Amino acid sequence: MINMRKAIFILSLTTILFSCNVEKSSNASSSDEAKNFIQSQFDFFTNSSLEEAQNTFSSDAVLIGTDAAEYLSGWDEIKPSIVGQLAIEDPKFMTRDLNIFMSEKGDMASYTQVLDFTFNIGGEAGEVKNVRNSGAIKKIDGQWKVVQIHWSIGVQGQAVEYEY
């Protein structure tokens, strides 16, 4: 009888321990998926594909660009900007310093990263370094989508001066 109680206790304890580990594995899997999506989110540029771009953004995504006029809400506003940007030839993104913050449910993440961007446009080579990129992605109907993306380029000086 004591051996049976011991066996039931050990079996129960093992079940509890393994069931607690499921969420961590699921969250680790979601984190890997999110990281892969973030790292591939600019593939539509490389492939010059408007269709891929539309599949990358949610229909109600917000894009905040480096130009003062670039505060775009929803795919209908984002699309013309993307069409213009797809004229860029041979785009290459070199990213670094990626930080990802996952939601507890593993269905949403925010991220920050820095990137360098090289390209050709009209036969002229171009390069932009140290672009700060952040955003939020969400799993919608089983697919990761950009729901918000923000681009900025640091300039010397502060818009509002303060000590730090």
Description of each model-found segment:
Residues N130-Q158:
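Short beta-strand edge/turn micro-motifs at domain boundaries
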Residues C20-E51, N55-T56, V160-Y164:
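Short, low-complexity N-terminal intrinsically disordered segments enriched in polar/charged residues
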